[in-house]
Amino acid sequence: MNSDSVKKSVVIDTDLEKLWSKISRITKMDWLEGQKSTKFLGEKKSGVGAKRLISFEDGSEVEEHIVGWKPKEYFSYIAVSGLPLDAYHATISIEKNKMKTVKITWESYFASKSTKNEFEEFIVFLSKFYAQSLKNLKNEF
């Protein structure tokens, strides 16, 4: 089994509350690269146990479940379907810096039984996806 991680960060010129308000609306992710729509799956709308289905412009869909939630600090989620992986856990965290900026970090760990080449291609894809999505988010402030 192949396993690896991807971690991307960006500093955004905003305050912590505004950034948390933006990223914690887990179905309002217009900054997510290639996202067409996102909807809730179930009654819970935030916090541990909330579920969402992200539909992408290429027709793919990814179902994610929130498994960690600390307001104004982080949320963690797992993908349960839609990715070419056997395991995927990610955390998006924010940290207040001096000078009214906030550092946002998107980090994930994943594993797959795919071939080494397929796995390496996915790592490149995911790294670019995180970087572009965070750039999109930064551009909204």
Predicted region positions:
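A conserved amphipathic terminal alpha-helix motif
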Residues: 109-141
